[in-house]
């Protein structure tokens, strides 16, 4: 493969990666913990919303640390799902190169 062709392919891959990044900004995932807490994040893992069911406040009324743990679990779940979504979208668009790029974002 000559240098010009390689450069063109790299530019196409870069453009596709940028398009995926824009899509991920609009895509959302939801992480949860015991059905009491939900965390919504975009495809980059940025937290967009946090929802507590009233039962969560009642169940952890005397255990604020337990509620904090539940929140962390839901946040981590949302971020894990966002990371998996990012890898999947990059791989779908760019194949093996996409998987490498997905790990970077």
Curated annotation (Swiss-Prot):
GO molecular function: DNA binding
Keywords: Cytoplasm, DNA-binding
Domain of life from the UniProt record: Bacteria
Leader sequence segment: none
Pfam families associated with the record: YbaB_DNA_bd (PF02575)
CC per GO annotation: bacterial nucleoid; cytosol
Spans traversing the lipid bilayer: none
InterPro entries given in the database record: YbaB-like_sf, YbaB/EbfC
Subcellular location: Cytoplasm, Nucleoid
PANTHER family reported in the protein's UniProt record: NUCLEOID-ASSOCIATED PROTEIN YBAB
Sequence similarity: Belongs to the YbaB/EbfC family.
Subunit composition and interactions: Homodimer.
Protein function: Binds to DNA and alters its conformation. May be involved in regulation of gene expression, nucleoid organization and DNA protection.
NCBIfam families associated with the record: DNA_YbaB_EbfC (TIGR00103)
Protein name as it appears in the record: Nucleoid-associated protein TTHA1599
């Amino acid at each position: 493969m000559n240098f010009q062709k390689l450069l063109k392919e790299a530019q196409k891959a870069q453009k596709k990666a940028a398009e995926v990044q824009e899509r991920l900004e609009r895509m959302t995932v939801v992480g949860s913990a015991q059905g009491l807490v939900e965390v919504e994040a975009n495809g980059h893992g940025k937290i967009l919303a946090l929802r507590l069911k009233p039962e969560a406040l009642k169940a952890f009324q005397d255990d604020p640390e337990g509620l904090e743990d539940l929140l962390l679990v839901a946040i981590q779940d949302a971020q894990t799902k966002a990371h998996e979504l990012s890898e999947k979208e990059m791989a779908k668009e760019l194949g093996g190169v996409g998987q490498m790029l997905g790990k970077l974002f």
